[in-house]
Every structure is written in structure tokens, then in C-alpha cells.
Amino acid sequence: MKITRRTVLRLTGAAAASLALSSCSASGSAILGSNFSSWLQQTLGISSSGAASSAASSEDMAASSLAASEQPAASLAALPAYDADPLTGEAKRSNGRIVGVMVNNISNTSRQNARPQRGLSSADLLIECKVEGGITRFCAVFHDADSIPEIGPLRSGRDQFLQLLMPYQALYYHDGESAPCTKFISVYNYSGLNIGGKSYFNTPTHPHVAHRDSRGRNVAYEHTEFTSGKEIRQAAANAGIGLSHDYDTTFFRFADYRTGEENAMQGAASGRTVSITHSDHYKTSFRYDPQSRTYKMQMYSRISGKFENTVDELNAKQLSFDNLLVCFAPIERYSGDSGDVQQVSYISGGDAYYFSRGAVQHGRWEKASPEHPLLVYDKTGAQMLFNRGKTYLAIVDDDEWSNFSYQ
């Protein structure tokens, strides 16, 4: 049997995820390491020293890259200490805890329709990935609870979003969750808020932390739930979860706000229009607006059969982003799942495309474990330099690479 790189990525990714869910305990990472190493030896004939060396070098690279990005250059010694907003790279606005809210994106029929959503234009980071049945879902990420307006419709949690938030101890806010997501939360003892999983939130002592609004439309009940920063604060207080956190790192490596540094994308290919296919009926596109220096978002609507502006219902504004990051990864159905819950093999890494200022840089991304951050590297092997501002992050199936385009 011929073993290609893609086969190896899928096999190792699936094995690692399975071990993470079934074998981890209080000594989680150690168990994962020993089991994964032995599995590699048996399956691919890799020596234990080789596997250990590879794992160690990967961890060393991540550690050194993070350390380098967090340490100011000697020439910056006279400047104030670097204290950036973890999601945008701008000067820090608060010491609040990052909050990620799961938002519905279904648009199949007039009754099964969550669009237009509310509150997405206020998110500092918007993550999109398919979850099941080809449908994508959003995780709207905010630098603190106080910055969250009314947002929704809410939907259930998925581990592919949770894993991106875990390294930052973000509050993960959702209604319901998949079985793999439940396992991740249990295995890693993660503090989140599944408001659909705690019946006491509906008692007089702990009032509702979300509200319903059909918006005068004949939509299914599951597409009518909304929340807000105020309600999230109440839910966190009810559960005894703190909403303060002093971050000393950022989600991406951002250009330094203290010096006005910028990634001018010199020598990069043109990237003024971007077309992303998540599945047959869930497609996202962007067009660069040179006046605002942002990318304007559109999504394909199965109902209308055409692309439509992605608009925040609260303010009628089209969603726009300073940065786009498209990461390709092996995605497939969880083995043994009775439905179509999707598993992202983060341990495999993959191609990354960073768009900003109307241009694109091609690189690689990696994520060593659920507790390690997503790291993005350019072609030289250095961490990709992001311009400050809002970012759209797409996690896209490798199988859709041929349908991805930009110009």
C-alpha cells in the first residue's frame, strides 16, 4: 500500500484525536505522547527516538517562536512595555476574559434560516468551520463580555472551535454541545458555559441567560435564541466563573502598535477577491475595499441561489475584516458518530493563506495539541506578521482546496 503525505496526516490526526479523547487523564499530555509514539512505530515503522525527536523539535519551535514574538527588540527598550489586545493587536482595552459565542449560520430554507445574524460586526475574531451536513457555524470571539451586544442566534458547541480557544482560557458560550465537545471539556477540565446543559439556569434563583426572538418570521424554534454581554455576565456569575484575565500574549503575531509597524505585504501576490468553499451550499467570499482597507464579506444563500452581503441585523452593516486567514486541514466525520459531526485534525497542520491590504502570503500553520495555540508561518519559517485589527479565520477541508481561489 502506498502511503502518501495526505494518508499519513489523516492517520496520525485521527489517532491523536482518538487518544486525546479516550486516554487522557490528569496526566493527559504524557499519556498522549507515549501512546501516539508507540502507534507511529507500529503503523509507520518510525523509531521511538525519531518520533520523540520530531515531537520535541515541534514543541521547541512553537516555544521559541512565541518567545520571540513576545519579546521586544532591543531598539524598542525605550518604549512602554508591550501590552496588546490579544485578539486585534491594538493597545489593550481591558483585562477582561476572552469570550467565544457559538452562532448559527444555517440557511437552507425559509424555516431553517438563521440569517441575518446579530452582533457579528462587533466580534474581534470570527471563526467559520463546517460542523455537520455541510453546514458551517461561527464562533464570534470578543476581547471581553462588556463588548458583546445582542448576539445570535445561538447554537451548540463543537470541539473544533473549543480547541482554538483553549490556549487562551476563553469563556466558551453555547447552547448544547456535541458528544466529542463534551469529552474535550471533561478530559481537559475546561470551564465553559453550556447554557442548554444546566437546568438550574431556568429557576427563579438563576434567571434565563438568553432570550427568544422569532423576529416576526416563521423560523424553527432552534433559530430564535439570542444572548448579550449582560446576560453572559449574569450566567458567569451564576456559575461562579470569573471574567477577568491578564493576557501577556496574542492570538496571532501582530505588528507592533507602539511603533505603527505594518505588514505592507511587499512582493506578495494580489489577493483582492477571495472565494472559500466549505461545502456545496456553504461558500464565503470577500472583496477588498481599498478605501477602508478591509475585506467585505458575502455568503452564498441556498434560499436565493446567489451570494448576498453578510450583514449584521443590529446595524445593517456589512461585515468587514482587516485580515483573512484561510487554513486547510483534514476534516472528516467522527468515527462511530451516528450523525455527521465533523472532526478537524489540527495535529496535522497544513497550508495557510493570509490576506491583508489586498494581497496574499502563502505559508503553513500548526497546532501541536488542543492546549497549544494555532501558529502561522510564512515561507521563510518565521511567524506570519498580521496587521492589527479584526480577523476572519476559516478552517477549511483539504478536499475543498481545488475550489478555493483568489486574485
Spans of model-derived segments:
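N-terminal secretory signal peptides and thylakoid transit peptides that target proteins
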Residues: M1-S23
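Bacterial lipoprotein signal-peptidase II cleavage site
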Residues: S25-G33, L40, A51
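Extracellular mucin-like PTS domains
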Residues: S48-S49, S53-S54, S58, S64-S69
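A surface/extracellular/periplasmic glyco- and lipid-processing/surface-interacting theme
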Residues: E70-A123, E132-Q407
